């Protein structure tokens, strides 16, 4: 497939729109091979289905890296963190869960990097630094993903077990 090919299927009176997109290559997120155009379709998807060749399972790493680089977080929940900018009062940090990856100094430093000097920050999830930065960027898509293995008839059972390590949870 060299172009995005749309299709519609009907299931239980629901019309489901499907886009078959070209294979994702290294550098797609930076525009190589019309990659940004192709990956932008995935940003708005309700589900990403990756068809993975069992003879080249390492390709999943390229796909995951390129999706991450363009701001798609497959099979991740959006962090439950609220940042409300305000006019005065400095940065107020509160949390309903223990924060094991962030401390107050790091949070304030990251907030300041984004030019916010007055904000209320509420953590309802224990997030990493990268997840907190994703919250502040506000341009990430959290999309469920399914990985399908293609050509399973060409590998034996032992190899199928080995393939499981390539498939993300």
Task: List PLM regions with ranges.
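Switch II of P-loop NTPase G domains
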Residues: 3-7, 11-16, 21-49, 55-66, ...
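Solvent-exposed, non-transmembrane amphipathic alpha-helical segments
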Residues: 41, 58, 69, 80-87
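Internal, well-ordered alpha/beta segment that forms a basic, Gly-enriched binding/recognition surface
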Residues: 48, 54-56, 74, 78-81
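Short, well-ordered beta-strand core segments
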Residues: 48-49, 145-147
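Structural motif
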Residues: 53-54, 151-152
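A short, gly/pro- and small-residue-rich
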Residues: 64-74
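Canonical P-loop GTPase G-domain recognition
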Residues: 75-114, 118-127, 143-146, 152-169
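Short, conserved loop/helix-junction motifs that constitute active-site signature segments
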Residues: 139-140
């Amino acid at each position: 497939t060299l172009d995005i090919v749309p299709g519609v299927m009907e299931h239980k009176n629901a019309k489901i729109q499907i886009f078959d997109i070209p294979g994702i290559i290294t550098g797609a997120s930076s525009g190589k091979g019309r990659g940004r155009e192709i990956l932008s379709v995935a940003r708005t998807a309700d589900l990403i289905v990756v068809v993975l060749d069992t003879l080249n399972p390492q390709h999943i790493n390229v796909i995951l890296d390129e999706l991450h680089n363009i701001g798609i977080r497959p099979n991740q929940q959006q962090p439950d963190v609220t940042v409300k900018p305000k006019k005065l009062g400095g940065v107020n940090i509160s949390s309903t869960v223990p924060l094991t990856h962030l401390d107050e100094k790091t949070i304030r430093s990251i907030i300041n990097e984004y030019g916010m000097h007055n904000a209320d920050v509420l953590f309802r999830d224990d997030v990493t630094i990268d997840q907190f930065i994703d919250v502040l960027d506000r341009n990430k898509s959290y999309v469920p993903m399914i990985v399908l293995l293609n050509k399973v008839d060409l590998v034996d059972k032992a190899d199928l077990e080995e393939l499981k390590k390539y498939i993300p949870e």
